[in-house]
Amino acid sequence: MGSISPLPLTPDASCCPREVILEKYQQERKKRQLNCVPDNEATELHHKYAPVQGVDQPSYTRSPIITDSKVVIIGGGLAGLVTAVKLKTQGINDFVILEKGAECGGTWHWNQYPGAACDIESLIYLPLLEETGYVPQSRYSSGAEIRAHVARIILKWNLGEHICPLTQVTSTKWDESKLRWEVQTDHSDSLTCQFLVLATGLFHEPNLPRIPGSERFKGDQFHSGRWDYAVTGGDPAGSVPMDKLATKTVGVIGTGASGVQIVPRLAQDAKKLYVFQRTPSSITARDNYTMTPLMTEPVIQKPGWQRARMVQFCEMLEAEEHEMSDKDGTVAEGFDALSLRKVLNGMRKDDVAPAQMGELYARADISLMESIRKHVSNTVDDHETAEKLKPWYPFLCKRPVFQNDYLSSFNRSTVELVDTNGQGVSCLTEKGVVANGKEHEVDLLIYATGFDYEIGTPFYQRTRIHVFGSHGQTLDDAWADQGPSTLFGIHIRDFPNLLYIGPCQAGVTFNFTHTIYEAADHISHVIGDCLKDGASFQAIQPSIEAQSDWVKQTEEGSEMRLQYAQSCPPGYFNGHGRPEKIPARWGYYPKGIKAWANAMRECRAEGMKGLERW
């Protein structure tokens, strides 16, 4: 299946007038805005249906660890593992990785639902391919292939001896008198370290909505990020059917990225499937195929090929002038829809006036969304169902989803879309789900309702970790009023020797592995410089001036971003419909990932410019 064709700057003649479309966008946003109440607290139901350690985890007891290390890394996902490898490359082996799950892998450990897969090209998403010599089997790797690669990384660099699994960090505190971080866990561990790396990830803490009657439902229920194969049958690899669903009626609440991947597999195996939708996703095709040596060998021959390919992907999305051969261009195939960004960057280079820029961008956006809505009509047989599956909002309001089989699943007689007209489900009963005033009886209910995302969400809510800085203030308290203040999104004043990996104030592209690479490079070099023999300092933090300047850069263009977010239906990108409540400094670094990486390299080249040392 091909990707959506490149965009014209004006809508197709066949689509509705622009004014009609924009009015439709506003109507759809308003009806959802009135019924959007984000859940900010964990409840007993949260712990029951989305347990911290997941389902079927082994019991794990051990003696408390009391030790001092150079580095403690919190999180054994891709960010934590890549950072660990980079530390070893710097000759630093005195580190501990604390992981709350039974295994490492982060997002891919928790999200083992059927159909879980990456929609970024595997050659740039799977980290450390060049170093391990592994070539992915598919253009877009399955969750099973990614988890196998995580195990490969751990084995190659002997990281197993550094990892403490099933260990939830509860608090960390900076001791200025000792220049050490104190780390406490749920195993009564007492660790100290000179450097603390927060690699706590993005999609691991389930967002479980408070639906009245959840405790009364008599069937099974769980969050998609804590899939229970004992209930469904099957396995994470998808090698066998979910045979226990053959006689069951299943309900799925949520049609975001996870729900879209789950539905096709459930449609195959369940006796009956109800899909409860508040807001439809924008669905485009994903052209997956087996990677052959003929395809990969020209790519992987040159040293440094993976980093170079990540940069090529970034350059294509940021519309930079770059000569690329046909085979290089395959890195962004399927991302033609993201040429919106090229439109925007092209206007910036041409010094288009801001007022005119918004107009041209809106036209391009409408054209793209008309293409996506037409794709729905061409795929879904039933006209009424197709109309309900059409997204009516600007393209980047919600995460774009690339999936071939989701829309066609609704052509099955056993699959029924329950569109809630933007209101969400009303409540649960003993037998099922009430939506639109009607009870839908189900045997199993699956919450594909996403995760607590970083932007605008308190750190403790996402991690269950209190982080205390040099003045006894928590990270959440420090950021409560105006939002985050950082240098590069990594260093935080009054939290010495703390190094943070996340999207906030950092360079971000659709391939978050690229962000991880650049952050891990910087972190490992900074720690390496501090630990060099003869180093005259043991602690670092950003200067007031450097941090303030970085925050100011992050806030640039915030007015245009706010205006766009206000046009969107509620979601985690816009604070669940209240973007004005989220300070601009929660945003990404607006100049892009390459400028971000260059700024960090300049810092290191100029003797850690912008960092105080003592």
Swiss-Prot record:
Organism: Penicillium patulum (Penicillium griseofulvum)
Described function: Baeyer-Villiger monooxygenase; part of the gene cluster that mediates the biosynthesis of penifulvin A, a potent insecticidal sesquiterpene that features a [5.5.5.6]dioxafenestrane ring. Within the pathway, peniC is responsible for the final regioselective Baeyer-Villiger oxidation of gamma-lactone-2-keto[5.5.5.5]fenestran between C1 and C2 to form the delta-lactone moiety of penifulvin A. The first step of the pathway is performed by the sesquiterpene cyclase peniA that generates the angular triquinane scaffold silphinene via cyclization of the linear farnesyl pyrophosphate (FPP).
Binding site for FAD: E99, T107, W108, H109, W110, D119, Y125
Keyword Oxidoreductase: yes
Family, per entry: Belongs to the FAD-binding monooxygenase family.
Enzyme Commission number: 1.14.13.-
Protein name: Baeyer-Villiger monooxygenase peniC
Tagged with keyword NADP: yes
Pfam families found in the cross-reference section: Pyr_redox_3
Residues marked Transition state stabilizer (site): R399
Residue ranges the record marks as coiled coil: none
Pathway(s) the chain acts in: Secondary metabolite biosynthesis; terpenoid biosynthesis
